[in-house]
């Protein structure tokens, strides 16, 4: 354990003169990691379209239901405050 012992020192790390290394794995950097901004604008357009397309029903259906409810309530309220709806307003406004 620890540092080199007497007559066992073979030089600094990577120095010529050391015995051949076994089991050394070398790694390289992926070309995609070397160019992180490659095609950024092209991918932004098509990726945004793909993501919006996959989520549109989760936004459009509740929005359509809310809009239909809002229009119905607005029209019903306008009807209640007309001469024709006065009787129903009295009945609803208990």
Curated annotation (Swiss-Prot):
Superkingdom classification of source: Eukaryota
Keyword Cell membrane: no
Keywords annotated in UniProt: Electron transport, Membrane, Mitochondrion, Mitochondrion inner membrane, Respiratory chain, Transmembrane, Transmembrane helix, Transport
Residue ranges annotated as Mitochondrial matrix topological domain: 1-49
Family matches, as Gene3D superfamilies: Cytochrome b-c1 complex subunit 8 (1.20.5.210)
One GO term of the biological process aspect: mitochondrial electron transport, ubiquinol to cytochrome c
Membrane topology type: Single-pass membrane protein
Protein name in the entry: Cytochrome b-c1 complex subunit 8
Species: Kluyveromyces lactis (strain ATCC 8585 / CBS 2359 / DSM 70799 / NBRC 1267 / NRRL Y-1140 / WM37) (Yeast)
